[in-house]
Amino acid sequence: MANLRTVDLTVGYQKQKIVQKITIDIPEGKIIGLIGPNGSGKSTFLKALARILLPMEGEVYLNEQNLQTIKTKEVASQIALLSQVSDSSIGLTIREIVSYGRFPYQKGLGRLTAKDYQAIEWALAATDLTELADASIHTLSGGQKQRVWIAMALAQ
C-alpha cells in the first residue's frame, strides 16, 4: 500500500489537455471512486497515476517521491492499472497472460525467475484460476476472463 498524491496535474494527448490542474491525495489503504461521464478523462487520469502517460504539467507523488524518479520495478510493485476493456482474442493460456504481470521485473532476456513463478501461482490461486491455468482464454466465460486480468494485475 502507498500514499498517492497529485499536485496541479494536467494530462492529455499530444497538445490536447484532457484533465487539467487536478490536486488529490489518496491516503494509504483508502478506496476511492472516480466517476464521470464518458470522455471526461477518468482513464486518462488513471494512466498518469500509473505512469503510462506523462504529465503535461504538475506532479504525481508515490509515498512523497515524484513518480517520474522512481524505478519502474518499484512503481509496478505499488501500482497496477486494469483496463476496463481487455482483449481476450489473443491465443494465450491463462498462465501466460498472468505472467505478463511480471514484465516490469524481468531483466536481460526476460526469463521468469522463481520469484516470478511464485507470484504467478499466488495470483492464480487468489482468483480461483489454478485449475484453469493451462486453458486458453477463449474457453472462459466473461466473468472468468475478468478474473484472468485481475490475476495479471495481482501478479504485478
Predicted ranges, named:
Residues 4, 19-20:
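Conserved structural motif at the start of ABC-family nucleotide-binding domains
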Residues 35-37:
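The feature captures the beta-strand-to-loop junction immediately N-terminal to the Walker
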Residues 50:
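Helix-to-loop junction immediately C-terminal to a conserved catalytic motif
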Residues 58-66, 75:
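Conserved ABC transporter NBD signature motif
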